[in-house]
């Protein structure tokens, strides 16, 4: 597979073509399954047919290091087999060290030996993630991790984590399709997360309820009451109000990113880069930025203060009703705000964005249109993404139909815009041409003929249709020999109209 590099806010392959990565999460959090999704090579072939070209592939710390300093290479071998299947189907992979609620005791992630909760109680809520805000055990265990408290062998928990990452990266070092390392899924601050929540509650009380001196415990109880939570969400539906709420918590959330997360990333990155010098460092935000709090994330630097190469911003984005069936109050304006905030961070960092998680949808019929709307955001920003997540029933889900779309996988030149219309099946792409092939995935390639393709901006071009074996989908390759031309490619129903519009514009 062609090697990828980071060039400013773009991914480029070794030919210099601009690459859009479009894929899915494959993460098994079930210890009974050995933390490996049961599947075979056929699933990866299907991923390719669906237009996916990247997988966020989950690792679990408990799977990699079940005892202090003892690594389970049999587990890593099973994961590696999936990486090989991905390569055989032209799928890039980045490894995600996944955790939810920090530990196998409460969710998934850290092994029991790395879970130091000081015997505090674990409390759960209506939604799994409520435990971040309610469980003393989860927060104490996270506090010990961020403090690098010694494990039973006298080695710090973070030091174990970095060494574990080094071992995993070295084990996978001969896999050419592994592009990077997502160092921790959704880092949560621990006890200081209560301060973030408290700041938001105080802002809500003041701006929505008109209470200047709120009873914080009483107000927090509104969020943890399933029925009253819906009333709180209604108060957060107005975007000016929601901006005030997320902005109120920005500084306290960013303190964690600057003072705790940044040195953790530096330590972990150094371990990974010692065995994978060019692997992408995939940087996530604090957990709270999933909801639109602006991240203060900084790029990783070496001990001399030099910014390391090949870093990628991999934020997540979910509306507040995620993991529920309340699609009637799903707020697309909040989603736009979340990703607009991530875009602001990208412009500050000047690195590519690959949205590591979004969606988490059920089979509700509304998820088709919701997915289309979110994908339109990614198209506008020219972002890469991996949908959360592969699961039983995925192929029949409404949202899966929205994920199966035409898009430019590799553009020979500088991509400026593209858009796919599910209603008409048409795709438009604007770019400034360079040497090489532009490779366009289309889910209905078998129905496309050369007369369905228009290339405006040059009279000299070549088109080749490359269907996938036994599939309706495939790749449409376009070669434009002229360099520096403003090119518009249209595939689908409005070819003649697009040419006329382009000529009038010129």
Task: Report residues per predicted region.
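Active-site mouth of glycoside hydrolases
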Residues: 3-21, 25-270, 274-279, 285-289
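Substrate-binding cleft of secreted/luminal carbohydrate-active enzymes
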Residues: 22, 310-318, 324, 330-405
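Acidic (Asp/Glu)-rich catalytic clusters
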Residues: 44-51, 172-173, 299-312, 343-350, ...
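Aromatic- and acid-rich polysaccharide-binding/catalytic face
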Residues: 227-249, 299-331
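Extended, alpha-helix-rich binding/interface surfaces that flank or overlap catalytic cores
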Residues: 367-451, 496
């Amino acid at each position: 597979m062609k090697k990828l590099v980071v060039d400013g806010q773009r991914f480029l392959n070794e030919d210099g073509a601009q690459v859009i990565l479009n894929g899915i999460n494959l993460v098994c959090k079930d210890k009974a399954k050995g933390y490996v999704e049961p599947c075979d090579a056929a699933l990866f072939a299907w991923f390719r047919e669906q237009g996916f070209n990247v997988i966020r592939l989950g690792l679990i710390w408990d799977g990699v290091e079940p005892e202090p300093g003892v690594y389970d290479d049999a587990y890593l071998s099973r994961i590696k087999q999936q990486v090989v299947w991905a390569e055989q189907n032209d799928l890039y992979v980045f490894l995600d060290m996944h955790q939810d609620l920090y530990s196998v005791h409460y969710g998934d992630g850290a092994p029991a030996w790395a879970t130091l909760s000081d015997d505090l109680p674990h409390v759960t809520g209506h939604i799994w993630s409520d435990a971040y805000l309610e469980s003393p055990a989860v927060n104490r265990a996270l506090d010990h991790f961020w403090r690098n408290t010694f494990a039973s062998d006298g080695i710090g928990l973070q030091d174990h984590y970095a060494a574990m990452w080094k071992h995993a990266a070295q084990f996978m070092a001969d896999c050419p399709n592994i592009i990077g390392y997502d160092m921790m899924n959704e880092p949560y601050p621990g006890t200081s997360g209560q301060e973030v929540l408290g700041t938001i509650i105080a802002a809500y009380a003041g701006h929505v309820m008109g209470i200047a001196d709120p009873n914080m415990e009483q107000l927090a109880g509104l969020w943890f009451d399933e029925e009253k939570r819906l009333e709180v969400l209604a108060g957060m539906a107005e975007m000016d109000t929601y901006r005030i709420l997320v902005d109120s918590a920005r500084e306290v959330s960013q303190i964690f990113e600057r003072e705790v997360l940044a040195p953790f990333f530096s330590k972990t990155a150094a371990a990974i880069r010692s065995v994978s010098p060019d692997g992408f460092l995939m940087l996530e935000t604090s957990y709270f930025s999933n909801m639109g709090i602006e991240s203060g994330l900084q790029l990783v630097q070496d001990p001399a203060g030099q910014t390391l190469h090949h870093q990628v911003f991999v934020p997540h984005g979910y509306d507040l009703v995620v993991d529920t069936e309340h699609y009637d109050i799903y707020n697309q304006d909040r989603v736009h705000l979340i990703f607009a905030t991530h875009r602001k961070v990208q412009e500050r960092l000047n690195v590519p964005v690959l949205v590591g998680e979004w969606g988490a949808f059920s089979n509700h019929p509304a998820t088709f249109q919701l997915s289309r709307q979110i994908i339109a955001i990614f198209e506008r920003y020219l972002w890469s993404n991996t949908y959360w997540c592969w699961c039983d029933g995925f192929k029949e889900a409404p949202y899966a139909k929205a994920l199966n779309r035409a898009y430019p996988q590799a553009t020979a030149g500088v991509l400026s815009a593209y858009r796919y219309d599910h209603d008409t099946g048409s795709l438009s792409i604007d770019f400034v041409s360079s040497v090489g092939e532009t490779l366009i995935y289309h889910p209905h390639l078998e129905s496309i003929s050369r007369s369905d393709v228009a290339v405006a901006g040059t009279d000299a071009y070549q088109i080749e249709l490359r269907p996938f074996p036994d599939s309706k989908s495939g790749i449409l390759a376009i070669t434009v020999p002229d360099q520096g031309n403003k090119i518009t490619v249209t595939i689908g129903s409005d070819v003649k109209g697009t040419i006329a519009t382009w000529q009038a514009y010129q």
